[in-house]
Amino acid sequence: MSQAKNIIQMVVMLTVVLLLSGCDTLLKGDGVVDVKGQYFDLANRSVAVVVSMSDFTEFNHPNAKEMITNEMTRRIMSNVPGVTATSPKEILAWQKENAYWATRPPSALIKQLKVERLILVEIGEYRTHEPGDRHVLRGVISASVHVVEAEAADPDNFGASFTKNVMYPEPGESKIGRVGDSEELIEVRTQIRFCESAAGVFYDHQIVR
């Protein structure tokens, strides 16, 4: 029950952040930056977003996988023309039912999920405060984002791979609006910043800092 309550609270917090930020950008800052996409072959294709992280990270941040799966899928659906995506709820249920899915080759995963493109988000570092000091809040997410292509001669060789490292707040970033920020809010803002960057490789977009 407490985990369900935590998820609801995180969803509400995420919704508030999105509404306050104009939905597709998180922070009001010094200017608008145009960012070019790097991989455009999701258009008019079926897609699944699958997020993996260590057991340690998942234990300490039990809502993280769901939140990132939801937000990555939402952004791709909102910005890539003609794309269809397997629902995050279905993906998360599939992961629970197939506990050792991460040990299987990408070619087997994309075949089982019955999609044309599989986006694998492999999260490495994930934290909400400075190492060794829980009183200094700073979110960090580092991950590899891989694209598996169903029709490739060898789907086990990724069609594209990207490395994403995000931090919130960044050193020197304006502190306006951060007085009294909680660890939960720092986590949500870091998740949004990560998804903005990770999903953004699939379409042209703007970010506000």
State the predicted function of each range.
Residues M1-V12:
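Bacterial N-terminal signal peptides that target proteins for export
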Residues N63-A64, R134-L137:
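Short, glycine/charged-enriched secondary-structure capping and boundary segments
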Residues C23-R45, L109-Q112, L137-V140, H146-R209:
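C-terminal/domain-edge helix-coil "capping" segments
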Residues S46, V51, D55-G124, A150-A153, ...:
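N-terminal segment of the mature soluble domain
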Residues T128-D133:
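Extracytoplasmic/secreted cell-surface and envelope-processing proteins
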